[in-house]
C-alpha cells in the first residue's frame, strides 16, 4: 500500500490588480520524487497555461 503525504497547498497563480501591466506568472511545482510519463507532464502543462479571456 502506498502512503499519501500531506502537501501544503499554495496558490499557483499570483493575481495582480493591474493585469494589463503585469503578466500573471503561473508555475506548476512537481515534487522531485514523482515519476511522470511525458503524457502525464503534458496533461499537467495543459492546465498550467493561461486561458484566453472570453468576450
From Swiss-Prot:
Biased composition, class Polar residues, residue ranges: 1-15
Tree of life domain: Bacteria
Region (Disordered): 1-26
Composition skew (Basic and acidic residues), residue ranges: 16-26
Listed name of the protein: Uncharacterized protein YciX
Organism: Escherichia coli (strain K12)
Amino acid at each position: 500500500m502506498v502512503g499519501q503525504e500531506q502537501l501544503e497547498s499554495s496558490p499557483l497563480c499570483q493575481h495582480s490588480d493591474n493585469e494589463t501591466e503585469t503578466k500573471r506568472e503561473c508555475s506548476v511545482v512537481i515534487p522531485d520524487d514523482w515519476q511522470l510519463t511525458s503524457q502525464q507532464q503534458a496533461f499537467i502543462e495543459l492546465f498550467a497555461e493561461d486561458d484566453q479571456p472570453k468576450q
